[in-house]
Design a protein with these regions (language model features):
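Flavin-dependent oxidoreductase catalytic cores
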Residues: 1-329
Length: 329
């Protein structure tokens, strides 16, 4: 059966830095509950998505260092060269169907549990994520990062990005959302610093920008570099310079990543089922991003209708149609 030509736009290739997605269907990062214990099962799981036609297939969060140890919850990691082989299986499986493989590199900051490593969680100002957010994440009292800690975290990100490239990933992420370390630097209620990493919005984005720039310097010649960022809380914060702090953050970082992956803040808002959340539910929060940056933008929104997907692209809301559960169903 031939395809209706009005949907052809959904199958256009999209350039993401030095790599090109073969179409606009993008499986955004999502947890699978699979750890390093079952690499072949994990590879087969992601391969099924690529076989189904997704242009980009992403991992879930990959810890970059033992200071971001999410035990007792299951989690994946890219801590050292021993982890490269298992992720190479996944990349090879994804590539066998012509899709790109994306690695969601992750440091959880104050929200991790560290039940195995026993390392005090890292944070901008020593404030537990559970101080204002109730959820499944850790509630330990975190340490305040000094500038040496900041340099170390950036170095861990770079090392993990290089390992991701060695495994075969085409896109590597910096994660600044959902309560994790980059996001904690962006939010004034968690970032009380008085140095160049705190205070104004311009200072609060500095850590995220440095993470992006260091990652691009390390692997940007061969890998696309994506920023995953939560915008819901920032959109609600007034700014002296823009319509909201979300607008200001995106403007300050507009040229930094090769791809913007934009989302809501927490599971109840970000992951509500389509029977309860209407299509394009995220649009009122993320609709401004493409007006600020020339880089491609991916987002989700309970998409079930190809006509809605086409509309998102033609109206300049998204460049890539993101989904997680549709890639599993």
């Amino acid at each position: 059966m031939s395809r209706n030509p009005r949907y052809d736009i959904l199958f256009d290739p999209v350039k993401i830095g030095p790599v090109t997605a073969p179409n606009r269907f993008y499986q955004v990062p999502h947890a699978s509950g699979m750890t390093e214990a079952n690499p072949r099962v994990r590879a087969a799981f992601r391969e099924t998505k690529a076989e189904g036609g997704w242009g980009v297939v992403s991992t879930g969060a990959l810890s970059i260092h033992p200071s971001s140890d999410d035990s007792p919850l299951p989690y994946a990691r890219l801590w050292d060269k021993n982890d490269i082989r298992s992720h190479a299986l996944c990349c090879d499986a994804i590539h066998s169907h012509g899709a790109l493989a994306a690695a969601e590199l992750w440091h959880g900051g104050a929200s991790v549990m560290n039940r195995t490593s026993r390392i005090a969680p890292y944070s901008p100002s020593g404030i537990s994520w559970a101080a204002t957010h109730v959820g499944f994440m850790g509630n330990l009292r975190p340490r305040v990062m000094d500038k040496k800690d900041i340099r170390e975290v950036i170095a861990w990100q770079v090392a993990a990005a290089k390992r991701a490239r060695s495994a075969g990933f085409d896109i590597v992420y910096i994660y600044a959302g959902m309560g994790y370390l980059g996001y904690e630097f962006l939010l004034e209620e968690y970032n009380h610093r008085s140095d160049e990493y705190g205070g104004s919005v311009k200072n609060r984005v500095r850590f995220v920008r440095e993470m992006i720039e260091a990652t691009k310097d390390a692997v940007g010649d061969t890998c696309g570099v994506a920023l995953r960022i939560s915008l819901e809380e920032l959109r609600g914060k007034p700014s002296n310079n823009q319509s909201s702090e979300a607008h200001e953050v995106v403007e300050l970082l507009s040229d930094a990543p090769d791809l913007w992956d934009v989302k809501m803040d927490s599971s109840p808002t970000d992951c509500g089922a389509s029977r309860f959340r209407q299509e394009c539910a995220h649009e009122p929060i993320i609709d401004f991003v493409k007006k600020v940056t020339d880089k491609p933008v991916v987002g989700v929104g309970r998409f079930t209708s190809p006509d809605t997907m086409v509309s998102q692209i033609k109206r300049g809301v998204l460049d890539l149609i993101g989904g997680a559960r549709p890639s599993i169903a």
